[in-house]
């Protein structure tokens, strides 16, 4: 084993347990973090937060959510443009809801459960969206950005964004659009649409 010396003079508490370690780069659009209960030093590609372990677990749950990734896809000036990671200042300025005691406990339970089953993150996503008080249509928008915008950035012309939608999806889109136009202009206006197969006469 090798002993490492911490030469940092300011904010040395970030290396003391318990602390949250945040990776500035992502894995398939998800940002990774971990709560450590032992002292550790790390390099410039990792960020550290020292604090109460319950709050650190809560932050880790929020950071691992699609809400966190969605926010930075839309607001970050470099991610998906010239760099494949976030800058420290961008992470520190992320708006995060202040939890109450019950929400802290729930976040800790989710965090502990994901330690044993990291792929079962449904509870994490639901918790994060509830914390931000997101409506159903806002959740759809978040999923679409991750599933299509990020996927296009990652896979380019192999992205699912280029796959032809199913007939049912076209019909659902038409019904939604017709409903919006009817609510906007009133029932007195008649709207109709046609679904073309092949090249559309436009």
Predicted segments, located by residue:
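Polybasic, glycine- and aromatic-enriched phosphate-binding surface used to engage nucleic acids
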Residues: 1-104, 171-202
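Non-catalytic DNA-recognition/assembly elements of restriction-modification systems
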Residues: 98-202
